[in-house]
Amino acid sequence: MKLFISCVLGLLFCAQAHAQLLIAPTRFVLDADTSVTEKIVVENNSDQPIRLEIKPIYRPIKATGLVRTDANVTESENIANWIKVSPPIIRELKPNQRRTVRLRMNALPDDMPDGEYRAYLWFSPIAKAKELSELDLSAKGQSNNGSAFQLNFHINSYVPVYVQKGKQVQDVKFTCENQSLTIRNDGNFQFNAKLNVDDHSEKLVLLRNAELSKSFPIGSKVSLLQDEQSLHECIL
């Protein structure tokens, strides 16, 4: 089974390491035909205890020039209902403390169409409120009635979970016009290739049932390669 690429045009929602929480691994690529249990390690690297909520969710992809061509794609590719996490809530994770969270992915039903499916594990850390002493008042601030307050913030993180069912089949069309390259992926599997524009190269990944339009300066020489084989060339 091919490995999935965890970011779509640099805009897929990759897991983040920030001031409160470290998460490993940062993505999962799982087999659709087998029920599996995986481990996730979370670590609180802030200076105060946090409460951590974890749950499987689906998130739509939004990017400039990207359109999903399947109106029901949310239902088509969403596997959040096949994922369970334990524990779903860690009531207190102390500074520098690590905990193991287990992800259970159930095998997809045999009658589900071949294709690629995805969901995300949503991690929501919230700093736990703590009492402030009188010595803290100058550093932490005071409210209008003289009582101490502390402003806490949290940043959600997302770990992608990908599943591929069946043998990959490609159904992609290319169009060059009006200074734009348009790639339409009508298949149920993601499309990936190397995009060359003049002297610049980048990895391009397009999700299933999606169309992407990218604009370039007039006269740009554009080519798409996959496994060193030319897929399409044009001059805009």
Give residue spans per PLM region:
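Intrinsically disordered, low-complexity segments enriched in serine, threonine, and glycine
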Residues: 170-236
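Short acidic, flexible loop segments centered on an aromatic residue
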Residues: 50-78, 187-201
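N-terminal signal peptide c-region/cleavage motif recognized by signal peptidases
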Residues: 14-16
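Short, solvent-exposed loop/turn segments enriched in Ser/Thr/Gly
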Residues: 24, 33-39, 99-100, 112-120, ...
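Intrinsically disordered, low-complexity Pro/Gly/Ser/Thr-rich segments with frequent PxxP/GP/PP motifs
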Residues: 72-110, 198-223
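Beta-sheet-dominated interaction scaffolds and their linkers
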Residues: 19-50, 90, 169-176, 184
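Short, acidic/polar linear motifs in exposed loop/turn regions
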Residues: 46-48, 109, 127, 184-189
